Amino acid sequence: MKIGILIAGDTEGELQTRYGTFASMFVRMFQQSRHAFSYAFYDVRVGEWPESPEACDSWLITGSVDGVYDNLPWMVPLQQLIVEISQSGRPLIGICFGHQIIAAALGGVVEKSDKGWGLGLHTYNVNADSVGEHPLPDTLRINAMHQDQVIQPPEGAEVFLSSEFCPCAGFFYGKNVVTFQAH
């Protein structure tokens, strides 16, 4: 299986020296599974784009220091690609900024939260009705580091993770899209 990693941001300086890039962190995570994956990397910030959603078997969008509302030039084609991947049926995962830009591309609303920053270990409620055949505990504790949030999920999205601080911390969209605010 070939995973396409759409790079929307990266670590810098000492963090990158110590922990690697966002893309390399995800590769290390996937390497811990029993499955063999190959990878294609697209730095969308500099105009690196796949030929089509079919260029990879599944897709992941990384985090970013940029906000969806910054409307940077690369965000419009990324949102178009998100819609195409969603419609193609290929699996798509969004983490942090990836969660936010997927929501925006599919009709949701993303804003800087009036609650400020969410930092540290947060407890999220799992909506059992939304996860269906994907067994999860009633709550998950995941590190958070964000001030932007999906304020309104896309129509048709099923929110499966929520907290008082972040009511839309993860959602399913159709059968092939899943997103997580925390990481």
Residue ranges and their predicted role:
Residues 11, 47, 67, 100, ...:
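Surface-exposed, flexible loop/turn segments at secondary-structure boundaries
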Residues 16, 51-52, 105, 153-155:
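Short, well-ordered secondary-structure micro-motifs
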Residues 43, 98, 148:
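Catalytic metal-binding/acid-base residues of hydrolase active sites
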Residues 106-182:
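Pocket-forming structural segment of enzyme catalytic cores
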Residues 4-6, 40-42, 60, 93, ...:
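Hydrophobic/aromatic beta-strand patches that form the interior of the parallel beta-sheet core
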Residues 62-130:
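Cysteine-nucleophile active-site neighborhood
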